[in-house]
Amino acid sequence: MFGKVKKTTIHFSFIILLNERSNYYGKNINDFKEFVEVWIHEVKIPISSMVLKCHNNKEKYDKSFLSQIRRLDNNIDEILYYVRSEDTEKDFAITEIDLKEVIRNISLKNKDDLLENNIEFKVELGVTSVNSDKKWLEFIINQIINNSIKYKKENESIIKITSKENKDKVILEIYDNGIGIPAKDLKRVFDKSFTVTNGRDKVKSTGMGLYIIKNLCNKLGHNISIESIENEYTKVILEFGKNDVYKF
């Protein structure tokens, strides 16, 4: 029914549409953002329908088709969160967050990709709560997990999430044994639209995910850093102060 997912057509159609609307709205950026949010919500309705239909008719659709649909859905989420991230302070609800619940939600969201790629998903939490915004923290961790899945090794892939307390901080580490990041690229991974050199031939990327979550972490008062050795591992480290609050 759906045929192949025409990613290039969707991408260029969206860019053309954004350019047209940007010219139309001119400097009224709030109207433009509102248009983008409405457009995205309308697009997500048929995508959700496609995902559901694929799940209910797995014999008709191969795994790669469903994977591409989920990837498209994630990219659209990325656009939505990028639009919202410019003035997220109005949307923050800082509370004590249960990390177990957050990670459970993320693992369920990515369950199909984890299973289809034979990725071992480990969670060992020494500390189970942090102060943050639940919705935005889920987005941040989900983006990191998506990167781990995209840049995995072909065999014996592992994603491991651990947490520990260190003086006045809670440290959450997300480790994978994927293709890693070249040393020369590590300083630029949070730059807008930057993609690592050893990942370009493996999978297409907007280069916006880490840029967005870095900005979000700054506003939430969290610290984020990355350690990596090419062809060995990548570790993303999130640090939460016990009294973290977001920054205006």
Describe each PLM feature range:
Residues 88-92, 125, 129-132:
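Conserved micro-motifs of the catalytic ATP-binding
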Residues 148-152:
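Short helix-loop "hinge" at the ATP-lid/N-box region of the Bergerat-fold HATPase_c
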Residues 176:
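Acidic ATP/Mg2+-coordinating residue in the GHKL
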